[in-house]
């Protein structure tokens, strides 16, 4: 999240519901939150879902990022995604994962249509940094990689696959602390039906996902980490595919056309046929192409960008790699004590049920509003 977005301007504020809520007019968009939140209120981001502002939580005296998801229940998939994200963030507790602070209850239960979620406030994200002209030392890049793997170790230990790791989902603050966000696409590690509801950003997508393999594993996140780290070192995306086919082409041109033994992981005959008709590219030596990158870093990336997910390095193994030796501390890389349960998604949920479940999350965090 980038705070470059706004400076505090006086937004009209009106107390509502007997002073329990305050309604702000942010550039014509209504922002109605509980009265513990006070100015300065600063718009810091805009997305397809709505608007994000930083605002002061007077109970903790902390500035938080407040995201408004307007008409959150209009689209069934989006509503499920919001519920999933809230439940996941409430379950996860780790220094390298964005912490949820609040789900604001609606003033009137029967008129519940917008969802407000507050999280820790961060200064920027990795996408902004990569695109900026801010210089990054190798130590910076190494430290970002270490924190990303440290957070991912915890996520995978909770039986969760993130599925959408990319630079804009890695938030940073001025101390170079990195926190993983955006769990709306996360999935259980042991689930076989392929979720097509959202398009994961193509550039960071593992080959098994490009090939529509339905039994993908946590290894897809490791592939994304390899792509992100190389983008950090080169200041440009490693595989900026224009479409599915182009993406696969870029992968094979750099990493070589997969051999028969690389394809053992997929039972999809169409995928195998597609690979077999590709031109036969040899694997390019990454160390030669990226001679400015530490050879030990290249060795680690090589192990992350391995075609066969069964042979790809795991997060735990990556943390143990020599390149991260001076940061790695096995006593300070915690795992999640309790696996996350995706059970709430097993039964088909209608709009009202999702609304009720999000309402219950809000009330759990704000018992006096129940």
Swiss-Prot record:
Catalytic reactions of this protein: L-seryl-[protein] + ATP = O-phospho-L-seryl-[protein] + ADP + H(+); L-threonyl-[protein] + ATP = O-phospho-L-threonyl-[protein] + ADP + H(+)
Modified residue annotations for Phosphotyrosine: 198
Modified residues (Phosphothreonine): 196, 201
GO biological process, one term: response to oxidative stress
Motif (TXY): 196-198
Protein kinase domain location: 38-324
GO molecular function: ATP binding; MAP kinase activity; protein kinase activity; protein serine kinase activity
Protein induction: By touch, cold, salinity stress and ozone.
Chief location bin: cytoplasm
Post-translational modification: Dually phosphorylated on Thr-196 and Tyr-198, which activates the enzyme. Dephosphorylated by DSPTP1B/MKP2.
Cystine bridges: none
PANTHER family: MITOGEN-ACTIVATED PROTEIN KINASE
Domain notes for this protein: The TXY motif contains the threonine and tyrosine residues whose phosphorylation activates the MAP kinases.
Name this protein carries in UniProt: Mitogen-activated protein kinase 3
Gene transcribed to yield this protein: MPK3
